[in-house]
């Protein structure tokens, strides 16, 4: 299967990711929460795209991307919170990803704007290197903006926990983050 960027170059999509960050910043969402909320929203969107390709869905009916995109106002916020709560109860990988998930975008107009912006792209079929470039850009911008670690990248604790839960290393094994 060929990867796509829907005719858009990397800088255009990186700009879109930062436009989303600006929307969330205007809603009072901090950088760490931005990363978390963007991850949840992109996961829901990519699961939907995967299902459209006939590859199945990891998410139960009633808690999918499609259940969000048609809503607005407090109904949208309520549904997003319901989805996060329900997915956190899953006993598999989904539950690990959404452990203690909570909504940090409490303004309906801001949540609707983020969903609209994410919905305008096909994220699932993007090349893995491209997705990595987006992640690196986010980390780099955080290092510049917060002067956190002078540009060094730190793996968030929630990500470390999720990796350990999924890999399930034995007491004598090591999991490395070579970056």
Enumerate the predicted regions with their spans:
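Conserved class I S-adenosyl-L-methionine
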Residues: 170-179
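Non-catalytic, mostly N-terminal accessory regions of nucleic-acid modification and defense proteins
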Residues: 1-171
């Amino acid at each position: 299967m060929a990867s796509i960027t829907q005719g858009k170059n990397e800088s255009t999509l990186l700009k879109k990711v930062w436009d989303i960050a600006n929307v969330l910043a205007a809603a009072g969402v901090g950088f760490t929460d931005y990363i978390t909320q963007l991850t949840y929203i992109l996961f829901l969107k990519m699961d939907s795209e995967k299902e459209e390709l006939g590859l199945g869905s990891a998410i139960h009916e009633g808690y999918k991307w499609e259940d969000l995109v048609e809503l607005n106002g407090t109904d949208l916020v309520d549904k997003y919170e319901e989805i996060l709560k329900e997915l956190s109860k899953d006993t598999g990988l989904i539950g690990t990803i959404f452990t203690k998930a909570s909504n940090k975008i409490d303004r309906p107009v801001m949540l609707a704007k983020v969903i609209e912006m994410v919905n305008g792209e096909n994220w699932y079929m993007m090349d893995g290197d491209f997705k990595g470039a987006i992640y690196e850009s986010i980390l780099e911008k955080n290092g510049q903006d917060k002067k956190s670690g002078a540009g060094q990248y730190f793996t968030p604790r929630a990500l470390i926990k999720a990796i350990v839960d999924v890999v399930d290393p034995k007491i004598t094994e090591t999991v490395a983050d070579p970056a």
